[in-house]
A protein has these predicted regions:
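Intrinsically disordered, low-complexity, positively biased terminal segments
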Residues: 1-182
Length: 182
């Protein structure tokens, strides 16, 4: 399973010039030790808890190293989610009979982040990219999350590669960016 995940992430990183080194870091013959951080939290969980969570992770890794556990990472790969806005399929169906008149708004191709800290991480990263999931959700799924908006959302993956030596600085920057306790 780890090999499949490694292969998947290396494949997705190839589409990004800023993450071109990731496949070689993840290769079996590489001496690099890449720690994988999965970032997912409840929707109503405030962003201010992010900095203490990363600080606790850093402390636990340090304690593990003191216990001679194999947690000596050279890099961290942070997986998160992003999205783009897409035109609603429901609106297209409603407007289909009308050949003339109001045209539907085209969705902007801007990428938005589910987690605001992702933007702060970019300043300390070796590279980052968004990627399309290999297995896409149902086409109507973007309409299911639509509430009082003209556009739906299309989720995609987001990965950020950070050198372990810059991890502490990144945590401080996240704290400054989000506010809250450090």
């Amino acid at each position: 399973m780890i090999q499949d995940l490694t292969k998947y992430l290396a494949e997705k990183a190839q589409s990004s010039q800023s993450l071109s080194q990731l496949p070689s870091l993840l290769a079996p013959e590489s001496n690099a030790q890449v720690g994988l951080i999965l970032t997912e939290r409840f929707i109503n969980m405030p962003a201010e808890i992010v900095t203490p969570m990363y600080t606790m992770l850093q402390e636990e890794i340090q304690w593990a190293l003191e216990e001679k556990e194999p947690y000596q990472f050279s890099h961290y790969l942070v997986l998160s989610k992003a999205y783009t806005e897409v035109a609603s399929k429901l609106d297209e169906e409603e407007n289909r009979p009308q050949k003339k008149g109001k045209k539907s708004k085209a969705a902007d191709s801007s990428v938005f982040y589910f987690h605001p800290e992702d933007e702060a991480m970019h300043h300390h990263a070796l590279g980052f990219c968004n990627f399309e999931y290999t297995t896409q959700g149902d086409e109507g799924a973007s309409d299911a999350k639509r509430t009082f908006q003209e556009l739906g959302i299309k989720p995609q993956g987001h990965m950020t590669l950070v050198e372990a030596s810059k991890f502490s600085t990144m945590i401080k920057a996240i704290g400054e960016y989000l506010g809250g306790p450090a």
